[in-house]
């Protein structure tokens, strides 16, 4: 009798544990970067805040492309096979052409400008499109980039004429080609060797890539993101909307609180990355150039007849979206 009671008690405990395990939800979060990257830290802040809230919710982060390939993350997110992801939204521009506007020259002037842009009707419209794919934004964030010249400084459009140039993104390639550059496409990891062998004379990439790939060893001049910059890429933390809606009110509140903290960190760290890149290039003896407001305006005029024109032609409702983005001061 005692043995039977013990077995029954053990079964009851096992059932309780099992029930508890079911109640404590686990969310899978994927991204492509290392655990030292700012985008991993953003994910980690949200995960840690949710854990500290003690709301029976755990976020398991899969960094370094360990769950999905970078450009293959959006579809699983829309289908609920993946709960959360940090990614450049333009990676999903094939599925939703409107997303290509989040990697477009001259739409974002500086970091404070993007913090206004994400609170504008432009972002509301983008989020409507995401909602149609069962996707929502938890954390907004843009990262900036600059220009590097092998033999000379690049600030305005005239500076790239005749140069073999690598650009970060199709829209930037279109604009640079319109300015007279010859485009050489390659991942940022190949810029160093291309410059070393003379294949490349100029490049456009993110502030962090300029440093992590030690491009200061190849460049004569660096034009970083400063008071104005041409290259900004939207890289948010997204979540499957149905997954979020199915969470308890307490779990949703914990996620939102963590997201608010992460977004403030993201903005600060994005600015810090730009400043850190300048210090690295100065230390290496590379000349530092600045893009003026006149330079920015000149680039934007070229973008209007190249990148912007192509976007509007290829995107349903593209003109409305572009106008909304350009209206944010």
Where are these regions (language model features)?
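Bacterial N-terminal signal peptides that target proteins for export
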Residues: 1-9
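N-terminal secretory/targeting leader peptides
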Residues: 9-12, 25-113, 119-329
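Sec/Tat signal peptide C-region and signal peptidase I cleavage site
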Residues: 19-24
């Amino acid at each position: 009798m005692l043995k039977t009671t013990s077995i029954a008690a053990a079964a009851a405990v096992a059932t309780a544990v099992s029930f508890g395990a079911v109640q404590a939800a686990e969310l899978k979060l994927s991204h492509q970067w290392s655990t030292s990257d700012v985008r991993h830290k953003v994910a980690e802040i949200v995960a840690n805040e949710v854990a500290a809230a003690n709301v029976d919710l755990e976020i398991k982060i899969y960094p370094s492309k360990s769950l999905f390939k970078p450009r293959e993350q959006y579809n699983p997110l829309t289908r609920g096979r993946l709960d959360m992801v940090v990614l450049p939204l333009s990676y999903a521009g094939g599925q939703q052409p409107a997303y290509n506007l989040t990697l477009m020259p001259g739409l974002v002037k500086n970091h404070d400008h993007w913090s206004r842009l994400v609170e504008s009707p432009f972002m509301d419209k983008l989020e409507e499109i995401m909602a149609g794919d069962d996707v929502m934004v938890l954390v907004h964030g843009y990262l900036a980039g600059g220009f590097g010249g092998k033999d000379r400084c690049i600030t305005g459009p005239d500076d790239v004429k005749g140069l073999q140039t690598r650009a970060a993104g199709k829209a930037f390639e279109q604009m640079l080609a319109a300015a007279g550059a010859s485009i050489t496409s390659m991942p940022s990891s190949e810029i160093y060797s291309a410059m070393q062998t003379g294949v490349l004379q100029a490049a456009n990439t993110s502030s962090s890539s300029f440093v992590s790939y030690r491009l200061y060893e190849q460049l004569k001049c660096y034009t970083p993101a400063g008071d104005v910059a041409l290259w900004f890429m939207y890289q948010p933390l997204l979540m499957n909307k149905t997954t979020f809606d199915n969470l308890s009110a307490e779990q949703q509140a914990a996620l939102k609180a963590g997201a608010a903290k992460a977004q403030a960190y993201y903005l600060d760290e994005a600015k810090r990355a730009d400043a850190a890149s300048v210090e690295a290039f100065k230390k290496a003896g590379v000349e530092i150039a600045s893009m003026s407001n006149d330079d920015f305006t000149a680039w934007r005029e070229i973008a209007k007849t190249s990148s912007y024109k192509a976007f509007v032609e290829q995107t349903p409702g593209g003109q409305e979206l572009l106008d909304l983005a350009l209206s944010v001061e």
